[in-house]
Amino acid sequence: MYSSLISPKTVNEHLEDPNWRFIDCRYVLTEPDKKQKEFAESHLPGATYAHVNHDLAAPHIKGKTGRHPLPKIAELSKTFSAWGISSSTQVVVYDDAGGAYAVRLWWMLRWLGHDAIAVLNGGWPRWLKEKRPISAEIFIPDTAEFKASLREHWLVTAEDVQNNFDNPEVR
């Protein structure tokens, strides 16, 4: 099981592994659909696209939430099931922004109890630099049963932060 960083070489060796899922998290805040279009042209073979606004965030409510609030757990579980992720699935996430968006999905899966998730070391730019295989084929994975096992202590509220702002025991 890989749970932090994973090399392009190791990922390349598992491209045909039915127990592995590759999730492309490329995204640009100022052009939300740009990277999804790029994904349609080229991505890791067998990858699924994760749109930050649609798949990895709940709708923004002006004055109430941040830009990308966490989705409801039931919605995330449904999305992960549709992506073919079960408790036995090794997931690899990547982006082209130094891991900024891939790490969001890495954290979400870990928060929901899925430890077999790793970030592609160097992301999409390194994959291309090493001339690894790419594809334009849209992969539709078999649905799996994702069961969330929430790690409640991984999430803090704004109130928690305010209440502990000056507490030297909380870092």
Task: Identify the residue ranges that each predicted region occupies.
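Cytosolic catalytic domains that perform sulfur/thiol-centered chemistry
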Residues: 1-171
